[in-house]
């Protein structure tokens, strides 16, 4: 079957249009207190080689012992990816030499991974979505870290990270643009955070991406791919794909051919650089690790873990749309972070869901973004924001005054109801007072009155003037009704 090509995703070269094909290998650090095969701490930071056991340092005679929590976290992740959980998997030795790999091999999984095929539903701009296939998820050890800036003539090795459990999540080459790739990684990180299986902190290296990029003319077979290693931000993932795709297009249009290789993205120079020729599986001489038995568990173990899973983003989004009447876009924004979704639910409980979403997304998120703060660091609690929504709904304050009240609560804290009482912020509902303000504005603007009778949209100007005259405290509905009556507008 011929694959359908979206013209909007094609990259224009000097001679032809080109399609970019992208597959991702995400390395997600497993959330656990100890490493995959030792009891050493996984805590970030600390002095070099503080969190190292004899197993991590590959001392002779030291044997690996599987960390059951890492196994459980991998199974939870597989379930969250709607993937096949393999009841039997095998750990293999992946043989290669790095100075910061003390064993001379990495314990990974090759032919028999713990998790098989799955999928991720990815939300795209303009309300579109796509399904990205997951090929596999396997457990493996992280390597240590070589330090080259401590001495001009020597390199040092820090093994704190050596042996930390990683989940390598391999996607199918289903992505066709840098935007899709960024959206995929964002969604995958959200799922991992909901599950509590990886914190997704790319700055600390908890989530790293290897990006496989190739280009082809539409309808042609897949081109030769290059792998861009260890991209550590979602923004850089997009830039690396664009840069590498254009490099390959330039070579092909010049009559050259693409060498299969591993490359590194340099965001400072905006280029990818060759690291080494890309290895094939046989180069690593995989074989089952003789120190580890095959990993086996039964379906009851999987079912027990499945029963403890939290509500995941797709299910939560569907529920927000159904229960609170939200648009797909607003629901998607709210479920992007678990803490944001929990905050919204606390505000919306027993209230108008759309009003609650409006205040959380536009006012709260807007202010948090402006100040570079996270939802966990908000000075306005869900209870306080819920009270502000109640005060508007009950007609106690107007929308304009509510924004002033939000600023006070943000800066000073306190009970919104008490602040409204103490500062005289209640909405003016006395029709006599509102009528006096309306009459004064009509009397002062006879020319506008005549224009409004011919052009009813000018009513908004009179409403604005009345609200201004009453300090924003007049009830907007009462103002509208009075003005329509006095101006003779239907």
From Swiss-Prot:
Signal peptide stretch: none
EC number(s) from the headed UniProt entry: 6.3.5.-
Q: What is an example of a Pfam family matching this protein?
A: GatB_Yqey
Reactions performed catalytically: L-glutamyl-tRNA(Gln) + L-glutamine + ATP + H2O = L-glutaminyl-tRNA(Gln) + L-glutamate + ADP + phosphate + H(+); L-aspartyl-tRNA(Asn) + L-glutamine + ATP + H2O = L-asparaginyl-tRNA(Asn) + L-glutamate + ADP + phosphate + 2 H(+)
Supply the Gene3D superfamilies for this chain.
1.10.10.410, GatB domain, N-terminal subdomain
Task: State the InterPro entries in the record.
Answer: Asn/Gln-tRNA_amidoTrfase_suB/E, Asn/Gln-tRNA_Trfase_suB/E_cat, Asn/Gln_amidotransferase, Asn/Gln_tRNA_amidoTrase-B-like, GatB, GatB_C_1, GatB_Yqey_C_2, Gln-tRNA_amidoTrfase_suB_CS
Top-level taxonomic group? Bacteria
PROSITE patterns in the cross-refs:
GATB
What broad class of enzyme is this?
Answer: ligase
Annotated GO biological process: glutaminyl-tRNAGln biosynthesis via transamidation; translation
Q: Which UniProt keywords apply?
A: ATP-binding, Ligase, Nucleotide-binding, Protein biosynthesis
**An example molecular function term from Gene Ontology annotations:** asparaginyl-tRNA synthase (glutamine-hydrolyzing) activity
The UniProt subunit note reads as follows: Heterotrimer of A, B and C subunits.
Q: What does this protein do?
A: Allows the formation of correctly charged Asn-tRNA(Asn) or Gln-tRNA(Gln) through the transamidation of misacylated Asp-tRNA(Asn) or Glu-tRNA(Gln) in organisms which lack either or both of asparaginyl-tRNA or glutaminyl-tRNA synthetases. The reaction takes place in the presence of glutamine and ATP through an activated phospho-Asp-tRNA(Asn) or phospho-Glu-tRNA(Gln).
Tell me the protein family, please.
Belongs to the GatB/GatE family. GatB subfamily.
HAMAP family, sorted: GatB (MF_00121)
What is this protein's name?
Aspartyl/glutamyl-tRNA(Asn/Gln) amidotransferase subunit B
Query: What is the originating organism of this protein?
Result: Methylorubrum extorquens (strain PA1) (Methylobacterium extorquens)
